[in-house]
Amino acid sequence: MGSAKILSFTLLLFVGYTLVHGSTPKHYIVYMGDRSHPNSESVVRANHEILASVTGSLNDAKAAAIHHYSRSFQGFSAMITPEQAKKLADHNSVVSVFESKMNKLHTTHSWDFLGLDTVYKNNPSALDSASNVIVGVIDSGVWPESESFNDYGLGPVPEKFKGECVTGDNFTLANCNKKIIGARFYSKGLEAEIGPLENIVDSIFFRSPRDSDGHGTHTASTIAGSIVSNVSLFGMAKGTARGGAPSARLSIYKACWFGFCSDADVFAAMDDAIHDGVDILSLSLGPDPPQPLYFENAISVGAFHAFQKGILVSASAGNSVFPRTACNVAPWIFTVAASTVDREFRSDIYLGNSKVLKGLSLNPIKMEGSYGLIYGSAAAAAGDAALNASFCKEHTLDPTLIKGKIVICTVEKFTDNRREKAIIIKQGGGVGMILIDHNARDVGFQFVIPSTMIGQDAVEELQAYMKTEKNPTATIFPTLTLVGTKPAPESAAFSSVGPNIITPDIIKPDITGPGVNILAAWSPVATEATVEQKSVNYNIISGTSMSCPHISAISAIIKSHHPSWSPAAIMSAIMTSATVMDNTHSLIGRDPNGTQATPFDYGSGHVNPVASLNPGLVYDFSSQDVLNFLCSNGASPAQLKNLTGELTQCQKSPTASYNFNYPSIGVSNLNGSLSVYRTVTYYGQEPTEYFASVERPSGVIVRVTPAKLKFWKAGEKITFRIDFTPFKNSNGNFVFGALTWNNGKQRVRSPIGLNVLST
């Protein structure tokens, strides 16, 4: 579903109102803080009365209202003008008013790569204990008939669960079981903004929790899919599919349609999920950059209330590539970047001179014989520039020149639709595509004709062959799945990057996990992105959408082992046990040229589920710590009172954000010497000593006091100081290092990021 279609319906919906009132209404969320109320009818009445104060009448208020939030926090959403929204923001019971923006979805072997078998081998009870953990998934729904959601061997639904199985199109009570224990759907917000879903042409959808997109099915099965053997995509990545926590339960919240998720619908889903009693909440979605302020963003607000209730919220960092584009960056959200695993999908090219070029693709189609090669630039349509044709854009290629040939195209920019190029070639009579993509080390795509992507080394060989051969030919081979490739992991080229645009002292993203070429369950009616648009039950896709459920699953495993741990403790355990080394014992890289990745790419590093179960030391923080953090970022006492339901005063000297007890250490404006403080809690059993070691950021002297921490029993807390003394400016860039505590058994590592403004 294209954004242009959605935009056209939005314009049609509001044009009449604009003519009458002279001001276009927009969809706003009116957030009123932590005042949940069991009597939803009284809340609705109160919301209508508040809304009527700006609309002029109760009837107009009822017509404008879309969602009412009352289960876990209070508020509503409504179609109102910017002027009316401004008036509501001044109401004494309102924390904030912000426009409901559109979020986007951040679109087997990975668990072996992470060593998850070791977790279950060393902890045989893990599968049983995980069955009491409930993971809420806010996404595009679920395909319940997938074998990944069978409930063989699972016990009764946990008594703590208060959710529902909501029926609808092609979805009955029988579609829920002891694996999918709850399912809801939300579309009011999106329909208020774009009109009825039925108006979206050429799109299959179900007005129910059933997934027509595939994305939600994929993420849910990655988290908690049951073990299913002999799974593949057209023979690729063949093996056993499973979720990271295959005994965990799933509660599905469908808030995304056609790849878009209205803030107001996501907020409603979070309101329900918190009330339903989920333990982990997974969101593979987020806003386009720039990231909205914390309390002008539905995900940040909803996640704060989840954090208060002991629910960890794991969310994808986004696929926006560039610096300062990471989303979902509130410190109470676990922000997940994407990285590769040690598996490649090779679709090589056999040239007419018998040389073989390395290509990457998800290409199951066998090409019979060899075909002529032609550059797209040499096949430009009449009146079109060769440059445009080299990118194989629509209407730029001459069908008479490409018919029966393999066309060599070039990626113009990172955001190019690579699949579309193959469609254009097929429509013109071409039989294959070689796509020059200098980032061709990551994502495997599916195409409608035999196609493969090549990087710089292969490009040079191909160009040399094309220059010397009068009638060049080639064959594109079907994909072979190679396991054990090196180096891995690498930061995914598409993964959004820090620094945190709102609070740069808080390093974001937090962690990275497998997000490239991940095989998981799929909706068989979602055929738009598959080879020749064929129906499949399992699919391979990439994105931070795929890495997020890996972290959600590992969080669920830790929660099952340590039910009393706070969300912050679970985050800390995963972050401080992460690795920054690949399988060649080198630092994790970012691109094919060997550029090293930084904490702005991978946060604290690549997740290590085995080590995260026994972290040794934890950087914990509470809801009160978050409130102190908000004070340092300008929150008023009135906002805090509405937020928490209690009178909360900010300290006269609020704690600086670089002293927030986060597992990473960031200072975005280092002017001369500075002391930063952290407190660790001992999560071991026996007396032990930890010793500090520092990887020093360039141009900065670092001293840790005390440099030795002695613990006698579990639960002990010790505060230490890190003194930074810069002797060289960093010229507007961050310099990185790390602090590690080590007791000979556990290493507790925190990345350091400093922007040195003056010495």
Swiss-Prot record:
Sequence ranges assigned to domain Inhibitor I9 in this UniProt record: 28-105
Keyword line: Apoplast, Glycoprotein, Hydrolase, Protease, Secreted, Serine protease, Signal
Catalytic residues (UniProt): 139, 215, 545
InterPro entries: PA_domain, Peptidase_S8/S53_dom, Peptidase_S8/S53_dom_sf, Peptidase_S8_Ser-AS, Peptidase_S8_subtilisin-rel, Peptidases_S8_3, S8pro/Inhibitor_I9, S8pro/Inhibitor_I9_sf
Superkingdom: Eukaryota
PA domain segment(s): 390-462
Residues the record marks as carrying a glycan: 170, 230, 388, 593, 642, 671
MF-aspect GO terms: serine-type endopeptidase activity
Gene induction: Rapidly induced in roots during development of arbuscular mycorrhiza (AM) upon colonization by AM fungus (e.g. Glomeromycota intraradices). Up-regulated transiently during root nodule symbiosis with Mesorhizobium loti.
Enzyme class of the recorded protein, top EC level: hydrolase
Signal peptide span: 1-22
Family in the record: Belongs to the peptidase S8 family.
Protein name: Subtilisin-like serine-protease S
Source organism (scientific name): Lotus japonicus
